[in-house]
Amino acid sequence: MAKAKFERNKPHVNIGTIGHVDHGKTTLTAAITKYFGEFRAYDQIDGAPEERARGITISTAHVEYESDTRHYAHVDCPGHADYVKNMITGAAQMDGAILVVNAADGPMPQTREHILLGRQVGIPYMVVYMNKVDQVDDPELIELVEMEIRELLSSYDYPGDDIPIIKGSALAAMNGTDKEIGEDSIRALIAAVDEYIPTPARAVDQPFLMPVEDVFSISGRGTVATGRIERGVVKVGEELEIVGIRPSKKTVCTGVEMFRKLLDQGEAGDNVGLLLRGVDRDGIERGQVLCKPGSVKPHTKFEAEAYILTKEEGGRHTPFFANYRPQFYFRTTDVTGTVQLPEGTEMVMPGDNLKFNVELIAPIAMEEKLRFAIREGGRTVGAGVVSKIIA
């Protein structure tokens, strides 16, 4: 059968495999590429190259494939620490995840940890692949494991009863044996992902937001703020709000400029200069955002899920304690904040991944799922994500 020409007109969805070590995440990833993409062997995926995201080195493998209705970008990480870092830095944003669980073992510590992390960093949907079912003779055992997985997902606020659980053997699918638990299970899995994980709203369809990178004044014209539009669209003549650091204030965009050309509008992904009415040179600064009025609020207190770098990764050499005061780098600027550790935690070691509360000295335009780096004098010592806004 001739492969259909690769068309970019299908909606795009980012997903990834998560789950306990050795439960078959990488084998499953390879098996999916065999039936839906350009086949990538296990060792091509396992020898993932290192990348840097927010000053942190992460090994991640990227594969792409497509179903009849969608194009998928899929991430798989070789090691557990890579998963933690990947999910927290958002290096590979996931619109949904495939949770791989070995039918013989059932949920294990990292299964739990990845589900919790998924909840904290805002992975909205999960589909389960129960792997290695050929290693379990008793069908009742498989049912028990399925119940256990559903209960575990429900305990972390995922809809455990509704989540599709596909049973199969990724290895059989790779080797082209035992079609029912091999190839058929992979096809059933992708069908479930197609149906259960919704297509995310495209960046241009979301409310406008642009982090301010630089500000300058043009004599006779006014103040221009430059940056890369994170999401949405801005049109000349629209009202915008300046949020963060100081009290919010409104302005009107009187011009959009890109590569020295005047445009009617700018959209997500564009690097633009926005001409602002009635704002003087000191009225706006790097670290603030321009956004659709009322769409984002400034906050100073939040709960974070964070990963603290090891010494080998260029992080701290020593632990930190309660009332630690580093800088939190949001989008384009550092803001000092104080860390409040959870009860029962005395100190945090380099290499730890934990949840704590932060109070910033100045407000930042903040939403849940916003990523940040933790820095000391310009050096990255950790990465985090806003898991909950407190005030």
Curated annotation (Swiss-Prot):
* Region G1, residue ranges: 19-26
Task: Quickly give the catalysed reaction.
Answer: GTP + H2O = GDP + phosphate + H(+)
Keyword annotations from UniProtKB, A to Z: Cytoplasm, Elongation factor, GTP-binding, Hydrolase, Magnesium, Metal-binding, Nucleotide-binding, Protein biosynthesis
Q: Which InterPro entries match?
A: EF-Tu_GTP-bd, EF-Tu_GTPase, EFTu-like_2, EFTU_2, G_TR_CS, P-loop_NTPase, Small_GTP-bd, T_Tr_GTP-bd_dom
State the compartments where it is located.
Cytoplasm
Q: What residue spans carry the region label G5?
A: 169-171
**Region: G3, residue numbers:** 76-79
EC number, as in UniProt: 3.6.5.3
| MF-aspect GO terms | GTP binding; GTPase activity; guanosine tetraphosphate binding; translation elongation factor activity
Main localization is: cytoplasm
Can you list the GO cellular component terms from the UniProt entry? Answer: cytoplasm
What enzyme class is recorded for this protein?
hydrolase
Detail which positions bind GTP.
19-26, 76-80, 131-134
Q: Where does Mg(2+) bind?
A: T26
Keyword Protein biosynthesis appears in the UniProt entry: yes
Q: Where does the record place the region G2?
A: 55-59
| Assembly information from the UniProt record | Monomer.
The protein's matches in NCBIfam families, at most eight in alphabetical order, are given as: EF-Tu, PRK00049.1, PRK12735.1, PRK12736.1, small_GTP
Q: What does this protein do?
A: GTP hydrolase that promotes the GTP-dependent binding of aminoacyl-tRNA to the A-site of ribosomes during protein biosynthesis.
Give the family per the record.
Answer: Belongs to the TRAFAC class translation factor GTPase superfamily. Classic translation factor GTPase family. EF-Tu/EF-1A subfamily.
Protein name, as recorded: Elongation factor Tu
Q: Which organism is it from?
A: Cereibacter sphaeroides (strain ATCC 17023 / DSM 158 / JCM 6121 / CCUG 31486 / LMG 2827 / NBRC 12203 / NCIMB 8253 / ATH 2.4.1.)
